[in-house]
């Protein structure tokens, strides 16, 4: 059969709330069986999490990210598992050859998220201002395509898209309409951690370059690219757990110590980034071991 096929049968939806953390699998058709979807309206804010190439929603870093969100604030976390279309289940030696197929599936998965969003807004009265998307690697571009589609559907913009080391291959030379772009949400936050698998391009309202966006500390010399690429997910979970864990310094002032940061010019990575006035590119020094925080207890 075709490799890495996308259709609504090859995607699963995992929903987590404080009351219901059991990570059961749902589809668009069975969503209404979930306790949260039996309500007339859903009042809590929603975060979608989308994984990347050859990964899945049950990979431990994504489980930890979802848990951090549910623990931190009363979010409903919707994890999109598109592992089949991301080539996760193809023969190990061959799956990398199918990357272009997975890359082209990102638009379809994004449209699928937009369909779920339409249901949330129309049937459950959720405001778009209460929905944000977090996507890693190819999942960052999935989130961008979802952001384009909801605007086509006249739903407005998502409040935020967080792109965790958006994938470089197949996307780097693309026009805005063919990749994650800063117009895809009210606020687009990009975390750069690698420069081969991930892009170095400025894509967002704010772009954070962790350790200059490559060779992240603690990743070693070998396989450091894959390790650095994955670090983006780990850093985001820590930034949700610890307020102002990672502070970004404007790249124009990257020699300045974090201790001199003010909330006018520096920005805390994470869910509160958009509350800071500063925009553009930021340098983020990172410690080599968890929780990786650079703020030495300082909160701006």
From Swiss-Prot:
Keywords: Allergen, Disulfide bond, Hydrolase, Lipid degradation, Lipid metabolism, Secreted
Gene Ontology CC annotations of this record: extracellular space
Reaction catalysed by this enzyme: a 1,2-diacyl-sn-glycero-3-phosphocholine + H2O = a 2-acyl-sn-glycero-3-phosphocholine + a fatty acid + H(+)
UniProt record, GO biological process: lipid catabolic process
Enzyme superclass (EC): hydrolase
UniProt-recorded Gene Ontology molecular function terms: phospholipase A1 activity; phospholipase A2 activity
InterPro entries: AB_hydrolase_fold, Allerg_PlipaseA1, Lipase, Lipase_N, TAG_lipase
Any one Pfam family match given in the protein's UniProt record, by short name: Lipase
PROSITE patterns associated with the record: LIPASE_SER (PS00120)
S-S pairs: 4-87, 176-181, 219-227, 244-268, 245-293, 261-266
Entry's localization field: Secreted
Main location: secreted
Record-annotated active site: 137, 165, 229
Keyword Ribosomal protein: no
Similarity comment: Belongs to the AB hydrolase superfamily. Lipase family.
Functional summary from the UniProt entry: Catalyzes the hydrolysis of phosphatidylcholine with phospholipase A1 activity. May act as an allergen and induce hemolytic activity.
Protein name, entry field: Phospholipase A1
Origin organism lineage: Eukaryota, Metazoa, Ecdysozoa, Arthropoda, Hexapoda
């Amino acid at each position: 059969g075709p490799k890495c096929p996308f259709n609504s049968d090859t995607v699963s939806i995992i929903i987590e709330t404080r009351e219901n953390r059991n990570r059961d699998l749902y589809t668009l058709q069975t969503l209404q069986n979930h306790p949260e979807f039996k309500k007339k309206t859903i009042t809590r804010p929603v975060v979608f999490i989308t994984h990347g190439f050859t990964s899945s929603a049950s990979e431990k870093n994504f489980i930890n990210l979802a848990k951090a969100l549910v623990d931190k604030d009363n979010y409903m976390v919707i994890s999109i598992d598109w592992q089949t279309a991301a080539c996760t289940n193809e023969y190990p030696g061959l799956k990398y050859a199918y990357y272009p197929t997975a890359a082209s599936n990102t638009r379809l998965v994004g449209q699928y998220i937009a369909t779920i969003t339409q249901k949330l807004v129309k049937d459950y009265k959720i405001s778009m201002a209460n929905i944000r998307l977090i996507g890693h690697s190819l999942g960052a571009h999935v989130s961008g395509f979802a952001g384009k589609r909801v605007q086509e559907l006249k739903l407005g913009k998502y409040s935020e898209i967080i792109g965790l080391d958006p994938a470089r291959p197949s996307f780097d030379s693309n026009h805005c309409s063919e990749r994650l772009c800063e117009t895809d949400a009210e606020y687009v936050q990009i975390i750069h951690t690698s420069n081969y698998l991930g892009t170095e391009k400025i894509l967002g309202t704010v772009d954070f370059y962790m350790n200059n966006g490559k060779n992240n500390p603690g990743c070693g010399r070998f396989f450091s690219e894959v390790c650095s690429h994955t670090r983006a997910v780990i850093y985001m979970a820590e930034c949700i757990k610890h307020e102002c864990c990672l502070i970004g310094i404007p790249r124009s002032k990257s020699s300045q110590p974090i201790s001199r940061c003010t909330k006018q010019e520096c920005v805390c990575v994470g869910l509160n980034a958009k509350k800071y006035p500063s925009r553009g590119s930021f340098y983020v020094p990172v410690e080599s071991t968890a929780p990786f925080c650079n703020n030495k207890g300082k909160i701006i």
